[in-house]
From Swiss-Prot:
The protein's name: Uncharacterized 10.3 kDa protein in vnfA 5'region
BP terms from Gene Ontology: iron-sulfur cluster assembly
Molecular-function GO term, any one: iron ion binding
Record family assignment: Belongs to the NifU family.
């Protein structure tokens, strides 16, 4: 099984987009909340900031800020969201 492509601004705009429907927003929130304790155990935290089209924006906090593993963390959230939403076009990007 190959790894999904890295989430970058460029990839987010060039790949096919299947928007996340409004009725799935509670599932997005629940998934982020379910994953937060694992991130918090390492001294970091996640905050859901926005969902637009197929892009989920998360604010990284605590030890996640500037951490070399933050891209891995976002990738893990993406994998979970792709699975629970059954939407391979979901992208998870850091909030500006």
């Amino acid at each position: 099984m190959s790894n999904p492509p890295l989430d970058t601004e460029e990839n987010a705009t060039t790949l096919a987009i299947t928007p996340i429907p409004a009725e799935s927003l509670p599932l997005v929130r629940e998934t982020v909340e379910r994953l937060r304790p694992g991130v918090q155990r390492d001294g970091g935290d996640l905050e859901l900031v926005a969902v637009q089209d197929n892009i989920v924006r998360l604010r990284l906090k605590g030890a996640c800020v500037g951490c070399a593993m933050s891209a891995q963390t976002l990738g893990g959230v993406r994998r979970e969201l792709v699975k629970v939403l059954d939407n391979p076009s979901v992208r998870v990007l850091p909030a500006p």
